[in-house]
Amino acid sequence: SRVSMECNRESIEKIKELYSHYLKNPSISTDSRSIKKGDIFFALKGDNFDGNNFVFQAIEQGASLVVCDNKQIEKGDKILLCENSLTMLQNLATYHRKQLKTTIIGISGTNGKTTTKELIQVVLSKKFKTLATKGNLNNHIGVPLTLLSIPCDTEIAIVEMGANHVGEIGFLCDIAMPDLAILTNIGTAHIEGFGSRENIIKTKKELFDFVKNNSCEKSHIFVNFDDEALKDETFSKKTTYSLNTKADISAKACCENGYAQIIYKDNLIASNLVGVYNAYNILAALTIGLHFGVELEQIKKAIEQYTPSNNRSQILKTNNNTLILDCYNANPSSCTSSIESFANMEANHKMVFMGAMKELGEVS
């Protein structure tokens, strides 16, 4: 595994030492401005900042330990010097993951992953103690932070994984070690970093590949049977779902005044999500809920009570207008879906405000 590959003996000892400290103070910070008493502060480097410059400020603010990688910093009781703070964060997260009995569901895809993640959590929390990625902390820093926020008594965690270059999902899987996986769909986001649609497909499928290659009793994949790039995925433990054709879990999409709904076995499941494209996100959450034995009535209740609050399919009413906020992120496929859905809504005067889309490379 990645941890043993990247660690010499000294590093493994440091991780164990760090882990015993983490168990007493299981709160991690990478931002010196928002440190709480007892936090472990990881001094990370970014394009415009270097956390090593804030080591002593972090201690003054109450950090119980600082992990840093600038050799100029003098050793102290609260300072753990290592080769690379980011690698140490990732390795600590993997070490914690290995101690957990928590079932981990990995989620990725071009569109809908954050909404689907939120829906899966509200559904599963009807029966289990759950945790899900906060916001979209889904990269090489966010995934370790998510793992390190999982208490030992968590039964199921839903970990979101994003990527903008080949190999990134595989790397995140090595850290999070998901037992189950779902890919919402495959579109054309971040194509600049991937180089081609084929590379996007290959990278997203690294999530399925990890689960298949590390098969255990819990292993399972959930396949969007309506997605051309995903429908032929083979694995002995898989569940397919579809809005258009016969699958393990089949439903029909409908829209009531702009809000996504699905009909499953004569049961109408409504939502507070604008846009018929959200029907897939609802169906994915239903499929996973059924897999884990959540009763249909509870699944329906969870989805119908969920209200988005993160500029994704969110509705705000003012005195004069109804605003639909779907502006957290954008790519050509998600934008097309949003506009088609908006076109089908009944309203006298409609207006669209669009921003730019970046990282599209050749297809700009």
Task: Please provide the spans of the model-predicted regions.
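Thr-Gly-centered strand-to-loop micro-motif
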Residues: T30-D31, A43-K45, A132-K134, V159, ...
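Active-site beta-alpha connecting loops in nucleotide-dependent enzymes
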Residues: L44-F49, S309-N311, C327-S364
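Acidic, Mg2+-coordinating active-site environments of NTP-dependent enzymes
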Residues: I59, C68-G76, L180-T322, A347-N348
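N-terminal leader/targeting and accessory segments in enzymes
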Residues: S1-N91, Y95, V274, A343-A347
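Phosphate-binding loop of NTP-binding sites
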Residues: M88-I221, F225, A229-K237, G289-L290
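Structural motif
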Residues: I40-F42, V67, G106, I158-E160, ...
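Short amphipathic alpha-helices and their capping/turn segments at secondary-structure boundaries
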Residues: V55, E60, H165, I169-I175, ...
